[in-house]
């Protein structure tokens, strides 16, 4: 800015010598320069506009403009700073929110992965357990079918045995057809005698054999048959029912009534519980506890050659018995075996054939009690 005093030789007015006009405001561009006459006109316009103002008013206006522009600039700067701070704060909050959401998403993804893994593991576990149960069920089914086949075979064999009415240990005296031809006994026939007195119609039986008639007359006892039918309607092994009570009183009790009463009671209990075992002496090779010698019957106390011995339940003790005692025990066992078959529903016959089989077994007990028994080979 140029503020030097104008020269006097240019003919400028004296009042303009104290005014300093900025070069910028007068348009000092090269193309707009004017003659001193233009300056006079400009100064005149300043005088008309300012009147009698103080010569220092123009610099004050410039300073005011400068201060106001600085204030505006400072306020704008503060406003921008505030807006920037707000924007930064909002951005920080958004960043924190984004970070939190990222953590939540990562946690959810981890939980989802763990849940998927646990579900697959549980599914595999359930499938494995199901396969194991299926395998066990199939194994049990095979075992059950095997047991069923075995039981069916046993039932078929028992039915065949019962239908033929032959007990497990038949009394050969009551079944002469089981004896060998040489021991079957005499047959009915005629023989010439040197004596002319008469003809003997029947050959006399050999000693030790019972004559077996070809035909026997049979008649049903109504009282016994009524008791049997009442028992057959509801089979039981309770010896207090009328049917079994009579058999116990008339056949089982006397047949198992031996001289040694204490051992007789034990034998009777073992027969009723189906826990008595009869063993041949020759087939035993292992040493066991012997309760008597082989030349004395443990039940009768008589000196007899004993080819069998009995064992009561799970006891290790054995008792040698004579052939007569064995026949009596066997007869009672045959009766109880048939009665158990009826109770288990294995006998499919009418009432009368079953009744006569019971009577035949009772007859075997009576004969054994009376001392009749088959001779051993």
Swiss-Prot record:
The keyword Coiled coil applies. Signal peptide: none annotated. Residues 23-57, 167-198 are annotated as: Disordered. The modification Phosphoserine is found at residues 169, 180. One of its GO terms (biological process) is protein transport. It holds the Pfam family Sec2p. InterPro entries: RAB3IL/RAB3IP/Sec2, Sec2_N. One of its GO terms (molecular function) is guanyl-nucleotide exchange factor activity. Residues 77-128 form a coiled coil. Selectively localized to the brain (at protein level). Disulfide bonds: none annotated. Keywords: Coiled coil, Guanine-nucleotide releasing factor, Phosphoprotein, Protein transport, Transport. Interacts with RAB3A and IHPK1 through the coiled-coil domain. This interaction is competitive. IHPK1 kinase activity is not required for this interaction. Belongs to the SEC2 family. Guanine nucleotide exchange factor (GEF) which may activate RAB3A, a GTPase that regulates synaptic vesicle exocytosis. Promotes the exchange of GDP to GTP, converting inactive GDP-bound Rab proteins into their active GTP-bound form. May also activate RAB8A and RAB8B. This is Guanine nucleotide exchange factor for Rab-3A. The gene is Rab3il1.
């Amino acid at each position: 800015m140029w503020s030097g005093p104008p020269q006097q030789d240019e003919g400028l007015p004296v009042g303009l010598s104290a005014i300093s006009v900025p070069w910028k405001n007068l348009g000092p561009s090269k193309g707009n320069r004017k003659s001193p006459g233009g300056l006079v006109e400009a100064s005149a316009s300043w005088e008309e506009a300012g009147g009698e103002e103080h010569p220092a008013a123009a610099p004050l206006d410039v300073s005011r403009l400068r201060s106001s522009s600085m204030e505006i600039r400072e306020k704008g700067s503060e406003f921008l700073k505030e807006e920037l701070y707000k924007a930064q704060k909002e951005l920080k909050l958004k960043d924190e929110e984004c970070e939190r959401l990222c953590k939540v998403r990562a946690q959810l993804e981890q939980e989802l992965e763990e849940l998927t893994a646990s579900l697959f593991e549980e599914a595999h576990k359930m499938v494995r357990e199901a396969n194991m149960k299926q395998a066990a069920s199939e194994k049990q089914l095979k075992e059950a079918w095997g047991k069923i086949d075995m039981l069916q075979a046993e039932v078929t064999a028992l039915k065949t045995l019962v239908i033929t009415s032959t007990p497990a240990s038949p009394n050969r005296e009551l079944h002469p057809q089981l004896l060998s031809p040489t021991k079957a006994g005499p047959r009915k026939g005629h023989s010439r005698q040197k004596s002319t007195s008469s003809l003997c119609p029947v050959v006399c039986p050999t000693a030790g054999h019972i004559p077996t008639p070809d035909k026997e007359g049979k008649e049903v006892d109504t009282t016994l048959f009524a008791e049997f039918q009442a028992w057959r309607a509801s089979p039981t092994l309770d010896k207090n029912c009328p049917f079994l009570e009579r058999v116990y009183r008339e056949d089982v009790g006397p047949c198992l009534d031996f001289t040694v009463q204490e051992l007789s009671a034990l034998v009777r209990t073992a027969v009723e519980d189906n826990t008595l075992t009869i063993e041949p002496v020759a087939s035993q090779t292992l040493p066991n506890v012997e309760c008597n010698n082989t030349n004395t019957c443990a039940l009768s106390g008589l000196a007899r050659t004993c080819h069998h011995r009995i064992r009561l339940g799970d006891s290790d003790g054995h008792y040698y018995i004579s052939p007569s005692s064995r026949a009596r025990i066997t007869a009672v066992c045959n009766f109880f075996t048939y009665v158990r078959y009826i109770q288990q529903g294995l006998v499919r016959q009418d009432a009368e054939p079953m009744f006569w089989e019971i009577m035949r077994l009772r007859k075997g007990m009576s004969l054994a009690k009376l001392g009749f028994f088959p001779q051993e080979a």
